[in-house]
């Protein structure tokens, strides 16, 4: 979802609402900046939330998820990384960064949308936070090359017909 640890910890059942598209969205206010964060709920996070509906810490409260301390969450992420052979120090904040770069920007989500989902006050923050990956630049340039090649082909075909 790209939410910071504290924002996930504070999520309540009331933060899941129908968006203008009729789909479920997380609509909450960021603890750090007090700005709105509006995030369409993708299938995997939706399944995770559904999986905890009957958890004792969730059933009798307004909380959406049973959240441990940030330190404990990071410890679990480290264990998961080790078990998966990932040689990176996974942290909750790194997950937020990965959402911003790899999940959204690399897949063509405009930076303005990413900024809105992350709840940044300024686009400048998102530009600094979610630096464009070399893969994204390469992908964008490949798409541009393809367009230019098609235009060049059309131009050659037009000249042949004259």
Map each language-model feature to its residues.
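C-terminal catalytic core of tyrosine-transesterase DNA break-rejoin enzymes
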Residues: 3-7, 79, 96-121, 128
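Conserved tyrosine-mediated DNA breakage-rejoining catalytic core shared by Y-recombinases
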Residues: 6, 10-50
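Catalytic cores of nucleotide-enabled group-transfer and carboxylate-activating enzymes in metabolic
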Residues: 21-24, 72, 102-103, 113, ...
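Catalytic-site neighborhood detector that most strongly recognizes the C-terminal catalytic loop/helix
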Residues: 30, 34, 70, 118-143
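C-terminal catalytic core of Y-nucleophile DNA break-rejoin enzymes
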Residues: 31-50, 59-79
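C-terminal secondary-structure termini that scaffold catalytic or DNA-interacting sites
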Residues: 56-59, 144-162
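Short basic/aromatic active-site micro-motif
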Residues: 67-71, 87-107
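Acidic, low-complexity interaction regions
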Residues: 68-71, 79, 84, 156-162
